[in-house]
């Protein structure tokens, strides 16, 4: 990705990529927790998007690629994933790049469902 990572006093690093991909990295004791904003989402939107979210969540879980979570206070859908091996810089960069690519793909897919 070629970006320097700077963590704040809360051990969090915020990234804005391509002007619309927002990702945060939270450094915990032995993991990095990645949070990526997918779409703003009203809790009363149609059933079809919630069904699609559950289908995608099952696929993510089966492939150990994170999980989708709804943040009620922000009315936002997030992709969350933990990087557990912090000993290999190449592995960290690879997982971060995969996460951002997954985040972008999910955003594109679910934006279409949100329009329906």
UniProtKB/Swiss-Prot annotation:
Coiled coil: none annotated. It comes from the Bacteria. Transmembrane segments: none annotated. Molecular chaperone required for SptP stabilization and secretion. GO terms for biological process: protein secretion by the type III secretion system. One of its GO terms (cellular component) is cytoplasm. The gene is sicP. It is found in: Cytoplasm. Belongs to the SicP family. Keywords: Chaperone, Cytoplasm, Virulence. This is Chaperone protein SicP. It comes from Salmonella typhimurium (strain LT2 / SGSC1412 / ATCC 700720). Its main location: cytoplasm. The structure of the SptP-SicP complex contains four molecules of the chaperone SicP, aligned in a linear fashion and arranged in two sets of tightly bound homodimers that bind two SptP molecules. The SicP homodimers do not interact with each other, but are held together by a molecular interface formed between two SptP molecules. The chaperone-binding domain of SptP does not adopt a globular fold for interaction with SicP. Each SptP molecule is wrapped around by three SicP chaperones (two chaperones from one homodimer and a third one from the opposite homodimer pair). It holds the Pfam family CesT.
């Amino acid at each position: 990705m070629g970006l320097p990572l700077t963590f704040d006093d809360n051990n969090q690093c915020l990234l804005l990529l391509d002007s619309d991909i927002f990702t945060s990295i939270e450094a915990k004791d032995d993991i990095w927790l990645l949070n990526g904003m997918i779409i703003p989402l009203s809790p009363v939107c149609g059933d079809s998007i919630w069904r699609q979210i559950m289908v995608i969540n099952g696929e993510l879980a089966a492939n150990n690629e994170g999980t989708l979570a709804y943040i009620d206070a922000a009315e936002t859908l997030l992709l969350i994933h933990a990087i557990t091996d912090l000993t290999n810089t190449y592995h960290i960069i690879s997982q971060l790049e995969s996460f951002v690519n997954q985040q972008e793909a999910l955003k594109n897919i679910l934006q279409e469902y949100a329009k329906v």
